[in-house]
């Protein structure tokens, strides 16, 4: 049986580079996920938004 969690990628809002992958429960959080993570290209903490 497959679970409700799916793998998503997080994209930097400033440079648009896809730096991180994580899992998300689609039943509980249906809106797009945004997290503050470190971007090695920007060299600072920036908001990362969920992409496919």
Curated annotation (Swiss-Prot):
Gene Ontology molecular function: structural constituent of ribosome
Alphabetical list of InterPro entries matching this protein: Ribosomal_bL33, Ribosomal_bL33_CS, Ribosomal_bL33_sf, Ribosomal_zn-bd
Record's keyword terms, sorted: Ribonucleoprotein, Ribosomal protein
UniProt key word Ribosomal protein: yes
PROSITE patterns from the UniProt entry: RIBOSOMAL_L33
Keyword Ribosomal protein attached: yes
CC terms in the record's Gene Ontology section: cytoplasm; ribonucleoprotein complex; ribosome
GO BP terms in the entry: translation
Top-rank taxon, per record: Bacteria
Matches recorded under SUPFAM superfamilies: Zn-binding ribosomal proteins
HAMAP family: Ribosomal_bL33
Family: Belongs to the bacterial ribosomal protein bL33 family.
PANTHER family: 50S RIBOSOMAL PROTEIN L33, CHLOROPLASTIC, LARGE RIBOSOMAL SUBUNIT PROTEIN BL33C
Name listed for the protein in its UniProt record: Large ribosomal subunit protein bL33
């Amino acid at each position: 049986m497959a679970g409700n969690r799916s793998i998503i990628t997080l994209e930097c809002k400033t440079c648009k580079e896809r730096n991180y992958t994580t899992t998300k429960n689609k039943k509980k959080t249906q809106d797009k996920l945004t997290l503050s993570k470190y971007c090695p290209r920007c060299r600072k903490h920036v908001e990362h938004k969920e992409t496919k």
